[in-house]
């Protein structure tokens, strides 16, 4: 007479394909005396499905970082002529949404702020207020010479000489104005930076 373990092994092998797990010899059904799940078509089907397939194992931080890089929502903050190129990057020719980079009108739903254009002293408090309303982790792309360091209006009394005096900047995109390709490259650099740092809180 064969043991319950042997019966379970025979039942699994007759269902087709090798088993993934060893027979559960210690957990027996008191009514039948056989291992729990032996002969159950559901367990046999699951066992068969998992027999030739692998599993994807990842750390939680890596999974969150991967998901974040593919679903960045950007807050539009167009201040001058650079905003035209910022709008161009979401048009069909470049289609930045294929990288998971979609625009949002609310700072409370945004991960990234693109400061595009000349930041004046009167606009600086509004920029900081919008930045403070964004949830953590939040990122800022400075687009254009005026946002980077004042640009053409560097010596003007009314212009902030670089928006990094108001908010921390993650990526600088140079140009006057930068092309849509340059902004797209800056977005890809930001995604690479997020993958490299991989922190949930900043």
Swiss-Prot record:
Enzyme superclass (EC): translocase
Protein EC: 7.1.1.-
Compartment annotation: Cell inner membrane
One GO-annotated biological process of the protein: aerobic respiration
Primary location group: membrane
Catalytic reaction(s) noted: a quinone + NADH + 5 H(+)(in) = a quinol + NAD(+) + 4 H(+)(out)
Residues that bind [4Fe-4S] cluster: 81-82, 146, 176
Biased composition (Polar residues): 1-13
Record note on cofactor: Binds 1 [4Fe-4S] cluster.
Record keywords, A-Z: 4Fe-4S, Cell inner membrane, Cell membrane, Iron, Iron-sulfur, Membrane, Metal-binding, NAD, Quinone, Translocase, Transport, Ubiquinone
Protein topology in the membrane: Peripheral membrane protein
Domain of life of the source: Bacteria
Keyword RNA-binding included in the entry's annotation: no
Chain segments carrying region Disordered: 1-32
Cofactor: [4Fe-4S] cluster
GO cellular component: plasma membrane; respiratory chain complex I
PANTHER family referenced in this protein's UniProt entry, alphabetically: NADH DEHYDROGENASE, NADH DEHYDROGENASE [UBIQUINONE] IRON-SULFUR PROTEIN 7, MITOCHONDRIAL
Function: NDH-1 shuttles electrons from NADH, via FMN and iron-sulfur (Fe-S) centers, to quinones in the respiratory chain. The immediate electron acceptor for the enzyme in this species is believed to be ubiquinone. Couples the redox reaction to proton translocation (for every two electrons transferred, four hydrogen ions are translocated across the cytoplasmic membrane), and thus conserves the redox energy in a proton gradient.
HAMAP family: NDH1_NuoB
Family in the record: Belongs to the complex I 20 kDa subunit family.
NCBIfam families: nuoB_fam (TIGR01957), PRK06411.1 (NF005012)
Binding partners and assembly: NDH-1 is composed of 14 different subunits. Subunits NuoB, C, D, E, F, and G constitute the peripheral sector of the complex.
Protein name stated in the entry: NADH-quinone oxidoreductase subunit B
Naturally occurring in which organism (per UniProt): Nitrobacter hamburgensis (strain DSM 10229 / NCIMB 13809 / X14)
């Amino acid at each position: 007479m064969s043991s319950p373990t042997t019966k379970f092994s025979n039942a699994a092998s007759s269902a087709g394909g090798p088993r993934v797990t060893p027979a559960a010899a210690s957990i027996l059904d008191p009514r039948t005396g056989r291992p729990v799940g032996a002969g159950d078509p559901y367990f046999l089907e699951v066992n068969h499905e998992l027999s030739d397939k692998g599993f994807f194992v990842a750390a939680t931080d890596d999974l969150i970082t991967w998901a974040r890089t593919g679903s960045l929502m950007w807050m539009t903050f167009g201040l001058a002529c650079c905003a035209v190129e910022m709008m161009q990057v979401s048009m069909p020719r470049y289609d930045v949404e294929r990288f998971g980079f979609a625009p949002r009108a609310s700072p409370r739903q945004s991960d990234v702020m693109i400061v595009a254009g000349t930041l004046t002293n009167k606009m600086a408090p509004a920029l900081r207020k919008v930045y403070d309303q964004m949830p953590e982790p939040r990122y800022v792309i400075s687009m254009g010479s005026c946002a980077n360091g004042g640009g053409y209006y560097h010596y003007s009394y009314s212009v902030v000489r670089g928006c990094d005096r108001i908010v921390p900047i993650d990526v600088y995109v140079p140009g006057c104005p930068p092309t849509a390709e340059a902004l797209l490259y800056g977005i890809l650099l930001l995604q690479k930076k997020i993958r490299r740092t991989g922190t949930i809180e900043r």
